[in-house]
């Protein structure tokens, strides 16, 4: 995999659009956004040579509105065409670069993996519960019960080493960023009672713990992810409405 610009500083309102040479592939990213990380993981897993442009999505770029009507990340650009939304980008990438296809070509198997990814969106919905606790620690017991339920459901859905089977695939790459955000939250004092080492816990979630360790240590994830320390700090700042440092850790 060849990703350049992963650790580049975020561009913001007033910055010029970086030139993109013909035939080049670009990912517009926000380093701490789980939705953007979905696209980054998929690009990395497919081994696409890509330039990464990190964005400040608070102080939005004027010209970026022509790429994404909401000014959000992620977006991918290739040969003058822009595709947005983390739920659509993976399928586009599989169709545009079929030689490294991740989703199965068999119609039935493809639908099964998409359904599994859809069921795992419950993990994404758990993240805002932790934002609420970051703002008010008295909500911890109430919110973490719901998080634990979601993790148990995810544990029960894991029938193999990975959600896609013997190797990580579509449901793994689309769900991992949200498990990671729960892991980040676990490192903050008083937010959720989960370990950061052997996350989310071998006793309660043995299959999920092995899965997470395999994912977090993989070359694909390591090529795009942020550290536990910086990720947790950014999450806390976002949840508590502090000024956001999009270049944290650079």
Swiss-Prot record:
CDD domains: GST_C_Omega, GST_N_Omega
Compartment annotation: Cytoplasm
Principal subcellular localization: cytoplasm
Reactions accelerated catalytically: RX + glutathione = an S-substituted glutathione + a halide anion + H(+); L-dehydroascorbate + 2 glutathione = glutathione disulfide + L-ascorbate; methylarsonate + 2 glutathione + H(+) = methylarsonous acid + glutathione disulfide + H2O
Segments forming domain GST C-terminal: 106-234
Catalytic residues in the record: 33 (nucleophile)
Record flagged with keyword Cytoplasm: yes
Knockout mutant characteristics: RNAi-mediated knockdown results in increased sensitivity and reduced survival in response to oxidative stress inducers cumene hydroperoxide, jugalone, paraquat and arsenite, and to heat shock treatment.
Keywords, ordered alphabetically: Cytoplasm, Oxidoreductase, Transferase
Keyword set includes Translocase: no
GO terms for MF: glutathione dehydrogenase (ascorbate) activity; glutathione transferase activity; methylarsonate reductase activity
Transmembrane regions: none
Residues binding glutathione, per UniProt: 60, 85-86
Expression across tissues: Expressed in the intestinal cells.
InterPro entries linked: Glutathione-S-Trfase_C-like, Glutathione-S-Trfase_C_sf, Glutathione_S-Trfase, Glutathione_S-Trfase_N, GST_C, GST_omega, GST_Omega/HSP26, Thioredoxin-like_sf
EC number: 2.5.1.18, 1.8.5.1, 1.20.4.2
BP GO terms, sorted: detoxification of inorganic compound; glutathione metabolic process; response to oxidative stress; response to superoxide
Family: Belongs to the GST superfamily. Omega family.
Oligomeric and partner information: Homodimer.
Function: Exhibits glutathione-dependent thiol transferase activity. Has dehydroascorbate reductase activity and may contribute to the recycling of ascorbic acid. Participates in the biotransformation of inorganic arsenic and reduces monomethylarsonic acid (MMA). Protects against environmental stress and oxidative stress.
Name of the protein: Glutathione transferase omega-1
Phylogenetic lineage: Eukaryota, Metazoa, Ecdysozoa, Nematoda, Chromadorea
């Amino acid at each position: 995999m060849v990703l350049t610009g992963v650790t580049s500083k975020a561009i913001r309102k007033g910055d010029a659009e970086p030139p993109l040479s013909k035939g080049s592939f670009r990912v517009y990213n926000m380093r701490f956004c789980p939705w953007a990380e979905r696209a980054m993981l998929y690009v990395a897993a497919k081994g696409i040579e890509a330039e990464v442009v990190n964005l400040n999505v608070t102080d939005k770029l004027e010209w970026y509105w022509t790429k994404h009507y909401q000014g959000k990340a992620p977006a991918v650009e290739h040969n003058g065409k822009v595709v947005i939304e983390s739920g659509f980008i993976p399928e586009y990438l599989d169709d545009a670069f079929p030689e490294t296809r991740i989703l199965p070509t068999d119609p039935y198997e493809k639908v099964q993996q998409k359904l599994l990814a859809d069921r795992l969106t419950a993990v994404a919905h758990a993240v805002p519960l932790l934002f609420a606790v970051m703002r008010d620690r008295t909500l911890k017991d109430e919110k973490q019960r719901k998080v634990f339920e979601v993790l148990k459901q995810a544990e029960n859905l894991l029938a193999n080493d990975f959600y896609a089977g013997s190797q990580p695939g579509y449901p793994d790459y689309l769900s991992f960023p949200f498990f990671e955000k729960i892991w980040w939250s676990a490192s903050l004092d008083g937010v959720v009672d989960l370990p950061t080492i052997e996350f989310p816990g071998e006793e309660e979630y043995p299959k999920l713990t092995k899965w997470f360790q395999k994912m977090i240590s993989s070359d694909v994830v390591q090529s795009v992810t942020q550290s536990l320390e910086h990720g947790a700090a950014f999450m806390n700042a976002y949840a508590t409405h502090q000024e956001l440092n999009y270049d944290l850790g650079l």
